[in-house]
Amino acid sequence: MKRIAILTSGGDAPGMNAATRAVVRKAIYEGLEVYGINYGFLGLVNGDIRKLELGSVGDLLHRGGTFLYSARYPEFATEEGQLKGIEQLKKHQIDGLVVIGGDGSYHGAEALTKRGFPTIGIPGTIDNDISGTDFTIGFDTALNTVLDALDKIRDTATSHERTFIIEVMGRDAGDIALWSGLAGGAEAIIVPEESFNMDDVVDRLNKGRERGKKHSIIVVAEGVMSGNEFAKQLAEYGDYHARVTVLGHVQRGGSPTAFDRVLASRLGARSVELLLENRGGLAVGIRENRIVENDISEILKEKHTLDQKLFDLASILSI
């Protein structure tokens, strides 16, 4: 192993730059050459590849987004796309690849591994929906972004004695909604993994009113329904004319938290070590504060599950 490359793919997440920095600096420390691939798998197929030096990743640790850029390239799922990618890797004499991203990125990494090219996956997505790790890079930052918004919205909800609905990201996973809702004291948390009944939500709000509570916050993951649709349905149950805030892509941006920076640094460094050990087809992660690695194929077979105990706790504490 003399030369490795790194790419970021799919939705950007705060901490991707920190992980890239760790890969580059760890690799150079170990005597390797490092190349950056712009625009993910699309850039790989197009040969958009550049050499990275120590200075290339300076002033990156605190920056959100990804300086390697990102793009979605579904054509990489085809044999033609994969063979073009391997052709470019061989052309640049690259011996191993690190891929930072979510589920779709892992599928690309798995495909390259099956074709004999050593590839390591690093979980980078704000949704925290990758198996084999307690946390993904970017989740903690997104969580704190949502919590900051929730706290500010509660101020105005209290002042005007209103119900507010906050729509957060989470197409298939409700971790952002659950963790931010618990941390922010939301009166109701609606996630894709748990069925809900509007009668139960209204009953919870009514009981709060009976105790003198004059405002409430409901956090809704986008994968369940839009915040506006939820507000429309809620309005059919009486005088709950809620205001809606859609946080949208603000959740993806911003300077990564200390947790995400440290996590990204640890995962990035470990991915280089695995390539030096000639161990491809793995995804790194963190379990109980220990860095672990698992077979990417096995990770893709597993479905991320919501922390049921945490969900139950949030329900208990929101009364």
Swiss-Prot record:
Q: The organism sits in which domain of life?
A: Bacteria
* Alphabetized InterPro entries for the sequence: ATP_PFK, ATP_PFK_prok-type, PFKA_ATP_prok, Phosphofructokinase_CS, Phosphofructokinase_dom, PKF_sf
The reaction(s) this protein catalyses: beta-D-fructose 6-phosphate + ATP = beta-D-fructose 1,6-bisphosphate + ADP + H(+)
PROSITE patterns given in the database record: PHOSPHOFRUCTOKINASE
What EC number(s) does this enzyme carry? 2.7.1.11
Q: In which pathway does it act?
A: Carbohydrate degradation; glycolysis; D-glyceraldehyde 3-phosphate and glycerone phosphate from D-glucose: step 3/4
Q: Where does ADP bind?
A: R21, A22, V23, V24, R25, R154, G185, A186, E187, R211, K213, K214, H215
Q: What is its main location?
A: cytoplasm
Top enzyme class, one word, equals transferase
* Active-site feature positions: D127
Q: Please, one GO biological process term?
A: fructose 1,6-bisphosphate metabolic process
Anything known on activity regulation?
Allosterically activated by ADP and other diphosphonucleosides, and allosterically inhibited by phosphoenolpyruvate.
The record, for Pfam families, names: PFK (PF00365)
What's in the keyword line of the UniProt record? Allosteric enzyme, ATP-binding, Cytoplasm, Glycolysis, Kinase, Magnesium, Metal-binding, Nucleotide-binding, Transferase
- Binding-site positions, substrate: T125, I126, D127, R162, M169, G170, R171, E222, R243, H249, V250, Q251, R252
Instruction: Give GO terms: molecular function aspect only.
Output: 6-phosphofructokinase activity; AMP binding; ATP binding; fructose-6-phosphate binding; identical protein binding; metal ion binding; monosaccharide binding
Cofactor(s) the protein needs: Mg(2+)
- Chain residues that bind Mg(2+): D103
Summary of the function given for this chain in its UniProt record: Catalyzes the phosphorylation of D-fructose 6-phosphate to fructose 1,6-bisphosphate by ATP, the first committing step of glycolysis.
Provide the assembly information: Homotetramer.
Q: Which NCBIfam families match?
A: PFKA_ATP, PRK03202.1
In its UniProt entry, what is this protein called?
A: ATP-dependent 6-phosphofructokinase
> Which organism was this protein described from?
Listeria monocytogenes serotype 4b (strain CLIP80459)
